[in-house]
From Swiss-Prot:
Catalytic activity: isochorismate + 2-oxoglutarate + H(+) = 5-enolpyruvoyl-6-hydroxy-2-succinyl-cyclohex-3-ene-1-carboxylate + CO2
Protein name per its UniProtKB record: 2-succinyl-5-enolpyruvyl-6-hydroxy-3-cyclohexene-1-carboxylate synthase
UniProt keyword Metal-binding, yes or no: yes
Gene: menD
Cofactor: Mg(2+); Mn(2+); thiamine diphosphate
A biological process term (GO) from this entry: menaquinone biosynthetic process
Length: 569
């Protein structure tokens, strides 16, 4: 092939790739600038079916794509140039793999003759993500390779894919076509009708992998005292159906922070703190059967409860085959959606309403939180509860890792409304949280609140640049307790060790950071000013930062006081 046609063929392959991705359900493409990915960048610039998102930092870019994929429940493409640019996506790819989010990484790469020979910005990119992504390594574009071979390779890899895919795209120079004089009509003629439709070249049916219990199995299972536990569930999976199932069986529904039901009045949302209480735990230990729907529970006390109880029958329901049982206690695992499992003809339990007292205890716990948190000193738990109380079904809440998500799990209020709730609890890292929340906010433009700790925000400071481009309300609430104060809750043997090696007090505040990116900022130290700032921010068409300044020990001391009261009650 003539050398001057190389750039045009590179662009053609990039165009074919992105066109097929759009036909396979990709709605968003996230791109970082770089030269070796130029064929993909130029193709994206001409592609009207994909919404473009650009950012200079590949680590934040990957997490933004993760948030977009979580919110859209569809695959999202990420384009980077060669070298360490690809490696910067690794944290987001790991999180996506562990939580079954379909990211598609398209990495520009040097051709084979420039690998492992000292060429600039050239590393060995195939399989860079190891077991955390399915791998496709494309050769350099070549007219000897029929275009349908490229399309069918993509179709097989992406159709029904629920985890990351890495497509490594090798390109020879020149990368920038000076003209578009090449005629590829003959080359594309083998595609037939594909050029005149909007369908993928190969269309795969949905695999039916569901496994459901028989009527006899369900009748045996519900014979006795049981509980239902709702783990991590996505907002679109009809979690309300679990409330109806709980009522039908007459078993209590214990809900995780990530279940979309933590604040529902018809469930036992305060389960983490109830397991502190001797009489509540004694009642719960009477349960003989458990139905766990979803995995990745947040509460260690709830995980320990599952491990410690002597279950006669332990069923787990997951959307696909995977291991999400760290106590290794489940005996029967069903592969089904929430809709499929709840729409079965379940019989009423022989021990229906055996634990009605739990509802009373759950309500008593809420009254305790109102007294000990809402009417006490200003602090992190008070802010988390205030945010949760104000949420509507049209809003979204992204809860950061470390202390914020635990405060929500422990103390979230009982409310009549709850918006969609998002977390990054696969690897549970504190990186990329702001970028992920930006992605969630950008998909449909719903008002979104992020609750994030100060160390997490320092990790992702660059992503304020992404936030500055948000056109819908994005409220970034930074709980600044001057360091990693979750370590106050852990048994570090010496206070100086805790301070010097774990907590790492920094003394930073975020006003200048917000100003650098042109984002409105408020600093608050009491509830009235927080609520006023929050209401302004949730109605502002763009990102806002509210920094909550609290003493280092405030949250941990309050948690300890409440735990002591509960244990004695």
């Amino acid at each position: 092939m003539q050398i001057e046609k190389t750039a045009e063929l590179n662009l053609l392959w990039g165009t074919l790739i992105l066109e097929e991705l759009s036909r396979l359900g990709v709605q968003h493409i996230c791109m970082a600038p770089g030269s070796r990915s130029t064929p993909l960048t130029l193709a994206a610039a001409k592609q009207s079916k994909l919404k473009q998102h650009l950012h200079f930092d590949e680590r934040g870019l990957g997490f933004m794509a993760l948030g977009l994929a979580k919110a859209s429940q569809a695959p999202v493409a990420v384009v980077t140039t060669s070298g360490t640019a690809v490696a910067n996506l690794y944290p987001a790819v790991i999180e996506a793999w562990l939580t079954h989010v379909p990211l598609i990484v398209l990495s520009g790469d040097r051709p084979p003759e420039l690998i492992d020979c000292g060429a600039n910005q050239a590393i060995i990119q195939p399989a860079i993500f190891a077991q955390y992504a399915k791998q496709i390594n494309l050769s350099t574009p070549d007219l000897a390779i029929r275009p349908e071979a490229l399309l069918t390779l993509l179709d097989e890899a992406i159709s029904n894919q629920s985890q990351p895919l890495h497509i490594n795209c090798m390109y020879r120079e020149p990368l920038y076509p000076s003209t578009m004089s090449a005629n590829f009509t003959q080359y594309l003629s083998t595609l037939g009708n594909w050029q005149h439709t909007n369908h993928a070249y190969n269309q795969y049916g949905k695999p039916n992998l569901s496994s459901l219990p028989s009527s006899d199995a369900m009748a045996r299972f519900v014979h006795g005292k049981g509980v239902i536990i709702a783990g991590t569930l996505t907002p679109d999976c009809d979690p309300q159906a679990l409330v109806a199932l709980s009522q039908k069986l007459g078993w209590p529904l214990l809900t995780d922070a990530q279940s979309q039901l933590r604040q529902h009045p018809g469930v036992i949302g305060n389960i983490d703190q109830l397991l502190h209480q001797p009489k509540a735990k004694a009642l719960l230990m009477q349960a003989e059967r458990v139905l766990v729907i979803g995995g990745r529970l947040l509460s260690k006390r709830l995980i320990d409860y599952l491990a410690q109880n002597k279950w006669k029958s332990y069923w787990q329901v997951l959307p696909r085959q995977m291991r999400l049982d760290p106590s290794h206690s489940a005996k029967q695992i069903w592969h089904a959606s929430v809709t499929n499992i709840t729409s079965l003809s379940w019989p009423r339990s022989s021990e229906a309403n055996w634990a009605l007292q739990l509802t009373q205890q759950n309500d008593e716990m809420e009254r305790l939180f109102e007294q000990q948190i809402d009417n006490a000193e200003f602090g992190e738990a008070m802010v988390v509860r205030a945010i949760a109380k104000s949420q509507t079904k049209q809003q979204q809440l992204f809860i950061g890792n470390s202390l914020p998500v635990r405060l929500y799990d422990m103390f979230a209020p009982i409310t009549t409304e709850q918006g969609a709730t998002f977390t990054n609890r696969g690897a549970s890292g504190i990186d990329g949280l702001l970028a992920s929340a930006c992605g969630v906010a950008m998909h449909q433009g719903r008002a979104t609140t992020l609750i994030i700790g100060d160390i997490s925000q320092l990790h992702d400071l660059n992503s304020l640049a992404i936030a500055s481009h948000c056109s819908s309300p994005l409220v970034i609430v930074i709980l600044n307790n001057d360091g990693g104060n979750i370590f106050n809750l852990l048994p570090v043997p010496d206070e100086k060790l805790r301070s010097d090696y774990y907590r790492l007090a920094h003394g930073f505040e975020f006003g200048y950071g917000a100003a650098m990116f042109g984002i409105p900022y408020n600093r608050v130290e009491e509830l009235e000013s927080f609520e006023e700032s929050y209401q302004d921010a949730i109605h502002y068409e763009g990102a806002s930062v509210i920094e909550v300044i609290v003493p280092q020990q405030q949250a941990s001391d309050q948690i300890a006081r409440i735990a002591s009261w509960i244990k004695q009650s």
